[in-house]
């Protein structure tokens, strides 16, 4: 189990709650007459979307890139995180002179609907009751997230996105953008993702959800009202999920069977091994910044994702006659979204007549490779965007 050190400090808990309703980022608010239609049949209104921008939008509004974050990410791509104080989660890719060059592009990232960093979700206050939504919040889907993002892009006055970029759950959003709004996406970079969640991945998510709900402090999702927090359950969920983001080779290289601050086993259930200590740290640090109910909602949204299901089971039909340029990226050691999933996406894109390139990057870093310092990946992303930019006229215009 996660040890006692995983209990969030009052300061972190208070700041996390504050960010849910009043984030330290830009906020687009949508009133009751601007509802967000959800796949479950409910119109969500009012609601808000928290977002960050980097760089400047050019006069022609042709240089906007939307970054879509993964399951446990948020809008703080390339700035210091307001809760943890750590650098943004994709500072390796976004910034001046980087593949998503903020001297050239206008980069946008919003917290997804259902998240816990300022966009409306289960951690937000329900305006009808004045209390936290909790499980009264409607179940959301990846298409719902994208629909909300499209409303934000409308609010920003942008008709067409130069590119939509994201990995994992973010990659699912990228693909959904291309299906739902093909005329609004000039280029797309879906990374380490799939067009539907596999049975294995659904099973991993259910394990995490059950860990959260088995924690007595979850209180049927009413932990905020009752002054508790399911830190143990959420910490275990994070530990289990984090294993799937890595690879056996990466774990062996980093930890092997080395002991943690000792030479001999304690013959107890302390963290004897370095890998145990590492996982406990991952669990304890996660609960300081993330809402447990949001974890339930976002994992469920990923589970429901299946592009082909809305096209009579024919994936290629979803991309038929698309004009979007694609670069699909996978990693050899990613067993959460293996290369076979990316190849299936590429085959469907080819069958639909799309312009698509595909790169499988050799690495032992697992699924999370897209978040790490990986020069080969950076080179591919950079080359793809430069090529697309030339076609769009960005380079020729000196923008």
Swiss-Prot record:
What Gene3D superfamilies would the database entry show? 1.10.1740.110, alpha/beta hydrolase (3.40.50.1820)
- Residues given in the record as substrate binding sites: 238, 368
Query: Which GO terms fall under biological process for this protein?
Result: homoserine metabolic process; methionine biosynthetic process
The protein's predominant localisation is: cytoplasm
What's a single GO MF annotation on this record? homoserine O-acetyltransferase activity
Q: Where in the cell is it found?
A: Cytoplasm
- What's one Pfam family here? Abhydrolase_1
One Gene Ontology cellular component term attached to this UniProt record is:
cytoplasm
EC number in record: 2.3.1.31
Q: InterPro entries, alphabetically?
A: AB_hydrolase_1 (IPR000073), AB_hydrolase_fold (IPR029058), HAT_MetX-like (IPR008220)
Pathway involvement of the protein, from the record: Amino-acid biosynthesis; L-methionine biosynthesis via de novo pathway; O-acetyl-L-homoserine from L-homoserine: step 1/1
Q: Where, by residue number, is the active site?
A: 168, 334, 367
Entry keyword set: Acyltransferase, Amino-acid biosynthesis, Cytoplasm, Methionine biosynthesis, Transferase
Q: Which reaction does it catalyse?
A: L-homoserine + acetyl-CoA = O-acetyl-L-homoserine + CoA
- Tell me the ranges covered by the AB hydrolase-1 domain, including all copies: 63-372
Family recorded in the similarity comment: Belongs to the AB hydrolase superfamily. MetX family.
Assembly with partners or alone: Homodimer.
**Job description of the protein:** Transfers an acetyl group from acetyl-CoA to L-homoserine, forming acetyl-L-homoserine.
Q: Please state what the protein is called.
A: Homoserine O-acetyltransferase
- The organism is Nitrobacter hamburgensis (strain DSM 10229 / NCIMB 13809 / X14)
Q: Mind giving the lineage of the organism this protein is from? A: Bacteria, Pseudomonadati, Pseudomonadota, Alphaproteobacteria, Hyphomicrobiales
The protein's gene is named metXA
């Amino acid at each position: 189990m996660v040890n006692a050190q995983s209990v969030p400090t009052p300061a972190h808990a208070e700041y996390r709650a504050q960010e849910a309703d009043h984030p330290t980022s830009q906020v687009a608010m949508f009133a009751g007459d601007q509802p967000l239609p959800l796949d479950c049949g409910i119109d969500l209104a009012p609601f808000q979307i928290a977002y960050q921008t980097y760089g400047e939008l050019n006069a022609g509004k042709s240089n906007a890139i939307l970054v879509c974050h993964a399951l446990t990410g948020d809008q703080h791509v390339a700035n210091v995180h307001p809760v943890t104080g750590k650098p943004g989660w994709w500072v390796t890719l976004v910034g001046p002179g980087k593949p998503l060059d903020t001297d050239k592009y206008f980069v946008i990232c919003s917290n997804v609907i259902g998240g816990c960093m300022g966009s409306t979700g289960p951690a937000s206050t329900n305006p009808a009751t004045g209390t936290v939504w909790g499980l009264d919040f409607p179940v959301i889907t990846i298409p719902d997230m994208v629909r909300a993002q499209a409303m934000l892009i409308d609010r920003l006055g942008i008709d067409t996105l130069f590119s939509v970029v994201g990995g994992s759950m973010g990659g699912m959003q990228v693909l959904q953008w291309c299906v739902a709004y093909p005329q609004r996406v000039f280029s797309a970079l879906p990374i380490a993702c799939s067009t539907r969640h596999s049975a294995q991945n659904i099973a991993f998510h259910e394990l995490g959800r059950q860990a959260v709900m088995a924690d007595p402090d979850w209180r049927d999702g009413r932990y905020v009202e009752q002054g508790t927090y399911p830190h143990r359950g959420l910490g275990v969920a994070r530990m289990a999920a984090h294993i799937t983001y890595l690879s056996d080779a990466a774990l062996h290289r980093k930890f092997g069977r080395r002991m943690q601050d000792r030479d001999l086993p304690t013959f107890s259930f302390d963290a004897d091994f370095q890998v145990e200590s590492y996982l406990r740290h991952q669990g304890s640090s996660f609960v300081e910044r993330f809402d447990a109910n949001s974890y339930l909602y976002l994992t469920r949204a990923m589970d429901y994702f299946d592009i082909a299901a809305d096209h009579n089971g024919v994936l290629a039909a979803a991309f038929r006659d698309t004009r979007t340029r694609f670069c699909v990226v996978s990693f050899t050691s990613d067993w959460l979204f293996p290369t076979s999933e990316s190849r299936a996406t590429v085959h469907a894109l080819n069958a639909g007549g799309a312009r698509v390139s595909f790169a499988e990057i050799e690495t032992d870093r697992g699924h999370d490779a897209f978040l790490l310092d990986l020069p080969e990946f950076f080179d591919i992303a950079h080359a793809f965007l430069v090529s697309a930019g030339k076609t769009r006229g960005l380079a020729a215009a000196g923008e």
